[in-house]
Structures are given as structure tokens and as C-alpha cells.
Regions:
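Eukaryotic helix-grip
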Residues: 23-201
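Repetitive helical segments and hydrophobic/amphipathic motifs
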Residues: 14-15
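Bacterial N-terminal signal peptides that target proteins for export
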Residues: 1-11
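N-terminal signal peptide c-region/cleavage motif recognized by signal peptidases
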Residues: 19-21
Length: 201
């Protein structure tokens, strides 16, 4: 990738991250345990809140990247992940398919993500998450998640890494408010806790 193209990608990502942040600015802490802080924000025009989880891990960005790029293996630490596979990998971009467990009586969900990885000049790593529901035909027995907008960000802090996981999802179909409200706290907290356990081994 040429320097101009790389600059264009970086600028584009900055705009995308800024738009995500603009949609969800008024963060309120919902849970702060085990060194993991989960905050929620209303998103204009959506019935579902955005979530943000932040924690410090005694690990390296290289190890975190390896754990994330092992797409099928990552299912063991992603909250309520049933199965996950890599559909396509091309340079700094990849496409993944995930099936999720859901509590009865909610129909199981699946999602297709376009992941763009950007290495920052400061040693940070950002993985932009974008839902692409039409990338694959819908699977029988699953409701396709209609929108995913978020990112992972890893920032070196001495011998630790600050990890931020922020997402806003439109899950498709109908979800009881009690289930949705529980998910937006459990998803970042449990995902970060499980990732931390593996990253710090």
C-alpha cells in the first residue's frame, strides 16, 4: 500500500471513528469490577444502547492481535459466541461470520463483520468493526444482526496495554428490553474478562 493510499485509509478510519463517537457521547458507567469499566450511551434513532468496555492488560499488542486474528479460536472468549469463522482475508481487511447463543425465547442471532486493522504511529492498533449483513445469504434458524458499528483499540501503556472495546448493534427482529439491557453490559465485560485471562497467560 502506497503512503498516499495508507493516509487515505487512516483519514477514512478517523472519520468513521469520529462518527461512531459522535453518535454515542454521553457515556454512563454501568459496571466497574475486576479492573474492567463498562459504560453505556444512548444512540440517536436507536432503541439499543452503545457499549464501551475499557481495561488494562499485562500483555503485548502482538499477543492481543494474534488472539483476535485466530478467528475460530476467538469464539472461546467472545461473549455468547457459538461458532465463528473467517470468510475472507485481504491485506489489512477481513470478513468474519459469527453465530451467537441467545436466551430463550429469543431467536439465535448471527452476524457478518468487515474488520479493518490500522496500525497507529504511536504503536497502537485499531480494528474497526462494520456489520455487512448482505455479504452472506441468511441462515435458516438465525436472525441476521442488521447493523454493527464499533472498534477495538489497543494502546501501549508501559508494560501494559489499554484495551477499549466499543460497539453499537442493531440486533434485528425484536429483543425484550430486559435481555437487551443485560446484553450491553455482559457482552463487553465478559468478553474483556475472558480475553484478559488468555492475553495475560
Amino acid at each position: 500500500m502506497g503512503s498516499l493510499q495508507r493516509m487515505a485509509v487512516l483519514c477514512g478510519l478517523t472519520v468513521l471513528l469520529a462518527s461512531t463517537a459522535a453518535q454515542a457521547e454521553d457515556w454512563k458507567v454501568a459496571k466497574n469490577e475486576d479492573g474492567i469499566k463498562v459504560s453505556l450511551s444512548e444512540v440517536a434513532g436507536s432503541d439499543y444502547k452503545a457499549y464501551q468496555g475499557v481495561t488494562l492488560m499485562k500483555t503485548t499488542i502482538a499477543k492481543l492481535r494474534a488472539l483476535q486474528e485466530d478467528v475460530s479460536g476467538a469464539c472461546t472468549w467472545i461473549h455468547e459466541c457459538k461458532t465463528q469463522k473467517l470468510l475472507k482475508h485481504e491485506g489489512d481487511q477481513s470478513w468474519t461470520y459469527t453465530q451467537f447463543n441467545t436466551p430463550w425465547p429469543v431467536t439465535a442471532r448471527d452476524s457478518v463483520l468487515h474488520v479493518t486493522t490500522i496500525e497507529g504511529a504511536d504503536g497502537s492498533l485499531t480494528r474497526k468493526l462494520e456489520g455487512v449483513p448482505k455479504y452472506l445469504p441468511e441462515e435458516k434458524g438465525f436472525v441476521r444482526v442488521t447493523k454493527v458499528d464499533g472498534f477495538w483499540k489497543f494502546v501501549p501503556k508501559g508494560d501494559q496495554v489499554e484495551v477499549t472495546y466499543q460497539v453499537h448493534t442493531e440486533p434485528g427482529g425484536s429483543i425484550p428490553p430486559m435481555v437487551a439491557n443485560k446484553f450491553v453490559v455482559d457482552a463487553p465485560f465478559n468478553t474483556l474478562k475472558a480475553l484478559k485471562a488468555r492475553a495475560e497467560k
